Design a protein with these regions (language model features):
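Long, charged, low-complexity, helical-prone intrinsically disordered regions
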Residues: 1-367
Length: 367
């Protein structure tokens, strides 16, 4: 985000997705859905319709699974194929699958064209009284994970599915990558997005590729593509490229403030953030209310190159009012007058961009 040069408009949004490698999709919309929030932080003129145009019209991004549901660059499509094959071979997506129902849903979409889950709401005599919406939604998700269906577009936030042959551009590379290619892709994506990374960060949720990632890291170091880095007072070994390290060493702080989504790529690996920035963060909407320290949906505050605090927002969409329920700064951080000016300016921009105005319910707390 510091000194980002992604340009503007829809093409700028595509560059962000390609640079980060994925943008997580999330249903929570306390202030803004995660995918829009993440892009807005890197592209100040971002408009929410950009993503659907890139997905539906330009076909330069697609929806699939990274570590979670995500938008991914179409140029990386082939790297989704090993996971899809895993599902074809029998893995179920969070639930037991019904192969008869899967075939019925797939046949309908082949015959009728793109459909949403709501198109399967009513009971069908052809399948008997056991057929209802929830099993059909599971079938859609299973077929999606297998790669037989793709999300052709979104209507509101609802997925519209079609068979892959009608969605995927013919020019896209559909060759299945080897383990070595997949490992190299994950390594290069992580370094490009983060500047420097640990082996365990790259292998996160990739148990079948741990050995391949370890071997490919060594190969890339030996070839000179990567260099090993030791961070002062840290035992871990990090990896970067010579070019990235030059950028990191010459990067100037921008004097900007960013309010990050809890699912932003910069914050999603909590242990990395704690280790490098000494910022202990978790989203507390999944924590029982009595045990929350910072609020239901606290957002990290990034100032220059430091995480300096967090605040818990709430949007009243009926009255177009944006509230700060709690505001906490990190121990040792004392806001200057300049910071307060920048914070208020950013808060106004953020709130007006989403909800027109803001109010503050509590004063800052120092922790």
């Amino acid at each position: 985000m510091l000194n980002s040069t992604f340009g503007n408009g829809k093409n700028g949004a595509l560059k962000v997705v390609e640079h980060l490698g994925y943008i997580q999709i999330d249903t929570l919309s306390v202030v803004a859905r995660a995918h829009h929030h993440t892009l807005w932080n890197r592209l100040p003129d971002y408009q929410e319709f950009y993503l659907n145009e890139l997905l539906e019209k330009d076909k330069t991004i697609f929806e699939y699974w990274s570590h979670a549901a995500s938008y991914l660059p179409m140029c990386d499509y082939r790297f989704s194929l090993p996971r899809k094959q895993h599902y074809i071979e029998g893995k179920s997506h969070w639930f037991d699958q019904d192969k008869k129902l899967n075939s019925y849903v797939l046949d309908r979409i082949k015959a009728e064209g793109a459909l949403q889950s709501k198109d399967f709401e009513h009971k069908r005599n052809t399948l008997g009284n056991w057929y209802e919406w929830k099993p059909a939604k599971k079938a859609l998700e299973q077929l999606f994970m297998e790669g037989k269906l793709m999300v052709a577009k979104r209507q509101g936030f609802q997925k519209v599915y079609d068979i892959t042959e009608r969605v995927l551009p013919k020019s896209v590379d559909t060759s299945t990558p080897t383990e070595k290619e997949n490992a190299a892709h994950l390594i290069k994506r992580a370094v490009r997005a983060n500047g420097l990374v640990e082996e365990k960060e790259i292998a996160y949720l990739q148990p079948k590729l741990k050995t391949a990632i370890k071997n490919e890291l060594q190969n890339l170091v030996e070839s000179g593509f990567l260099i090993e880095i030791k961070v002062e007072n840290k035992s871990e070994t990090y990896f970067s490229t010579p070019e990235q390290l030059t950028v990191l060493n010459t990067l100037k702080t921008s004097g900007e403030i960013h309010f990050l989504s809890p699912f932003d790529n910069a914050i999603i690996q909590r242990k990395r953030v704690q280790n490098l920035f000494n910022f202990d963060y978790q989203i507390e909407c999944y924590v029982p209310e009595a045990k929350r320290k910072f609020g239901y949906f606290c957002l990290p505050i990034l100032y220059n190159n430091q995480f300096v605090g967090r605040f818990d927002p709430k949007a009243d969409r009926k009255t177009k009012t944006f509230y700060i329920k709690q505001l906490h700064f990190e121990k040792g951080f004392k806001p200057t007058q300049n910071f307060e000016t920048l914070f208020n300016e950013k808060l106004n921009t953020f709130a007006k961009n989403k909800f027109t105005l803001h109010e503050r319910e509590t004063l800052p707390n120092y922790i």
